[in-house]
Amino acid sequence: TAEALLLSCMDYRLIDDITRYMDGRGMTNQYDHIVLAGAALGALTDYCKEWNKTFWEHLKIASDLHHIKKVILMDHRDCGAYKVILKADFSKDQQMETRIHGKFLRDLMVAIHKRYPELEVERLLMNLDGTVQKVS
């Protein structure tokens, strides 16, 4: 069984940092991983409805096959998908950027809990230096 399903962004700048973060948590080979541009935003947006379907199908398989206990949602700062989909650059105002990511991370958490109330959901925001903060 896997402990969790991780949703992260496709940004090439952070792939190694994501792996290092998960390894640092002692989760090497303990999680399934789905990658969508924009992470939480990608799973929710109407910009590409196929991404919504893909996320939910992956979550179902992770739950049914690997009996995951939690979903880890990891957005990151200076996300190009947020710029493209929302047509705004929030990276210049860190507080606003945190609020915007927080909104989509919360919205996805609520949607997950509606379908899978038994799953724990973590909401994280990665900085470009690879450090991670929890988002409330």
Segments (PLM) and residue ranges:
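Divalent-metal-activated hydrolytic enzyme cores
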Residues: 1-18, 37-53, 61-70, 80-136
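Short Gly/aromatic-enriched secondary-structure transition segments
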Residues: 19-26
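A generic structural signal for alpha->beta connector loops
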Residues: 27-30, 118-120
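A short beta-strand-loop structural module common to alpha/beta enzyme folds
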Residues: 29-39
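Short, ordered loop/turn segments at secondary-structure junctions
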Residues: 76-78
